């Protein structure tokens, strides 16, 4: 199962890094990177990350009464990938935003209360802040998403 998390981590980091380079700046949000690539890339990455995370995260939270948070978060990540065109389609916008809020909230709660690696999130938020001091206010959504996903991937490893 650890193989799945390694694959998800490598795919996410590669996608993230190349997206920042391609954009020549920090994106406003992770979802905004959808518009930088052919239409299949962002959905493929989010689906791969969501489905790869699911069995490993469920195993990592086994026995916890909050295990359902990992399921909700993974499913929400997959739905974000299935509804990427949030700027041009009102229905996709609604689904995308609801799933983004659910994924963020449930991942954050799981990271803090179940996995116990809340300090990893703080470290990555600080690193993101230091890498973008002047533009952090404009890109705060991206930095929060990025820090949360990387913290989560590392804490499950």
Language model segments and positions:
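Hydrophobic, membrane-inserted alpha-helices
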Residues: 49-54, 102-110, 124-129
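Juxtamembrane "helix-exit" motif on the non-cytosolic side of transmembrane helices
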Residues: 57-61, 82-89, 113-114, 130-136
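Small-residue-rich segments of transmembrane alpha-helices in multi-pass membrane proteins
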Residues: 40, 97-112, 144-157
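Residues within membrane-spanning alpha-helices of integral membrane proteins
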Residues: 6-9, 46, 50, 67-74, ...
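Membrane-proximal helix-loop-helix units in multi-pass membrane proteins
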Residues: 67-122
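Terminal transmembrane helical module of multi-pass membrane proteins
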Residues: 115-157
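Helix-coil boundary and interhelical linker segments in multi-pass alpha-helical membrane proteins
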Residues: 1, 55-67, 109-120, 157
